[in-house]
Each structure stands twice: as structure tokens, then as C-alpha cells.
């Protein structure tokens, strides 16, 4: 018996999965000229957007339930292997600079850890216990949320994490790119992004990866909107951590509060880099500590804080 025959998870036939089936449009992929090749990819890459649109109800449900838990101090974890895991890490890493969120609030957990970001560690995804262990190492608990990402829906690492989440009462959300009857996953919310067979058979870094990234973008951004980190379409909790973001903060102060650039620099410094505090201070005359107290009273919701004082921003 070979080492492959001895492991049922490794030797299982996955040919029935939508993501593993050959795409009839690309049977002569290697014979196409470059222009035809590019055109075919462009045409197929319209499918991820429709797949995400078709899953909008389950994505909306996920956003509301995640936001509710995060308001109560819970955290959001993305768990995956290979491309799926890397996309989770990418989305989580963007939350602190965009929304000034605590790095602990949204975390990406990748099979194989940081080294797997640069060098593929695909074999680690076959270890179901590893999914549970990696979550345990981060103190994952009943108040937290897990989005288990597995394009083909069969990854033991992700299945193990989702099973663990459900067993302790955490929110378990599955995200896969095959129908649920092809690969059922233990979860409270089931997000299925049906992008169809890949042009390069089985290469789920393509359409499946694109749809996954789109869905994660929506989830994290919509959750942060619900948490009050956005006013209108401005990221009013942006972290002023580099010159580009300082410039963005100053433009937000100008556009929302009518605050000129030089005054904005002074206010931003007094507010410790917080756009929200700077806007409240400029509009109300409150000191930084008083503005912070007002904001905390309204759970960080800038619009509510302004309304409580009878104030309005330039763009309300």
C-alpha cells in the first residue's frame, strides 16, 4: 500500500466537484493565440461578479451576524489553505490601516502560517486537527466568528475549523465555490460562490479566487460600516500612518468639515490622528477628551454623536 492509498482524504476522487471539472470553452487552451487567450479569460472573469451577486442574501446575513458579535467584543477569523487562506490574510491585513481597527479584531489564519504566504504548503491542508489547533492558539472562543474558506469545499483544515467553531458556539460561516450538495460543510451560514469550472482545470486561484476576494471585500467593508467606521462613503476611522493616508485624512476633514489643510494638520495632531475626533472638536468646540467621551457614548457612530449635539457636517 502506498502512502497515498493509506490516506482516504488524500486519495479521494474529487472529480465531481464543479471546480475540478474541465471547462468546455478551454479544451484547446494551448492552441489559442495570445489575443484569443486573453479574450477568453476576460469573458470568463465576468462570472465571479454574478456568482457573488447570487450569494448576496447569505453574504448579507453573514455581515449582520458578524457585526453583532464584533460590537460585543468578538473577533472575526478567516481560515483557509493555499489561495483561499492567503486571500483571508490579505483582507484581514487591510482592516487596521483602512479602519483603524485593532489587529486582533480581524485575523487571517493560513495553513502553514506565515511561511505559506510565500511558499506553497499545500499538504498541510489535509490535517483536520490543524484547523482546530491554529484557532485554539489564537484563543478562538464562543463570542468569535469564523469564515472558513475552501474553494472546492473539501479542505480538511477548514472543515476541522468550522466543526470546532460550531462545537463551542462560535459563529461558523462557510465560503466555497461548489454547490452545497457536492461538498456540505458544517456551518451556520453557507456562502456558495458558483463560478463554474476554471479555464485551467482545477486552478481555483482564478475565478474562484476572484469571487472569494470580492466576497471578503464586501464582508469586511460592510461590517466596518455597521460598526460606525464609515461616514457617507468616507473612511473616517482611517489610520494616519503614512503620507498618503495623512493626505486622505486632511481631505476628509476639508470635505466633511470645511476644515482647511493647515488647520486640519493642527486638529489632527490634537486628536491623536483621529479624523472622527478632529471633526467633533472642530464642530463642537469640545476638547479631545470630551469629544472622545461623546463618541464612546454613541458606540463610535459619528453621525449619532453629531445628531446628539444638534450638529451637522458639510456633507451629511
UniProtKB/Swiss-Prot annotation:
Catalytic activity of the protein: N-acetyl-D-muramate 6-phosphate + H2O = N-acetyl-D-glucosamine 6-phosphate + (R)-lactate
Region (Disordered) residue spans: 1-24
Alphabetic keyword roster: Carbohydrate metabolism, Lyase
Transmembrane domains' residue ranges: none
Catalytic machinery residues: 94 (proton donor), 125
EC main group: lyase
EC numbers on record: 4.2.1.126
A Pfam match: GKRP_SIS_N
Domain SIS: 66-229
Record-linked InterPro entries: Etherase_MurQ, Glucokinase_regulatory_CS, MURQ/GCKR, SIS_dom, SIS_dom_sf
GO molecular function, one term: ether hydrolase activity
Top-level taxon of the source organism: Bacteria
Keyword Lyase: yes
Pathway note: Amino-sugar metabolism; N-acetylmuramate degradation
SUPFAM superfamilies: SIS domain (SSF53697)
PANTHER family registered for this protein in UniProt: GLUCOKINASE REGULATORY PROTEIN
Stored HAMAP family: MurQ (MF_00068)
Additional observations: A lyase-type mechanism (elimination/hydration) is suggested for the cleavage of the lactyl ether bond of MurNAc 6-phosphate, with the formation of an alpha,beta-unsaturated aldehyde intermediate with (E)-stereochemistry, followed by the syn addition of water to give product.
Self-association and partners: Homodimer.
Family: Belongs to the GCKR-like family. MurNAc-6-P etherase subfamily.
Protein name (record): N-acetylmuramic acid 6-phosphate etherase
Organism per entry: Parasynechococcus marenigrum (strain WH8102)
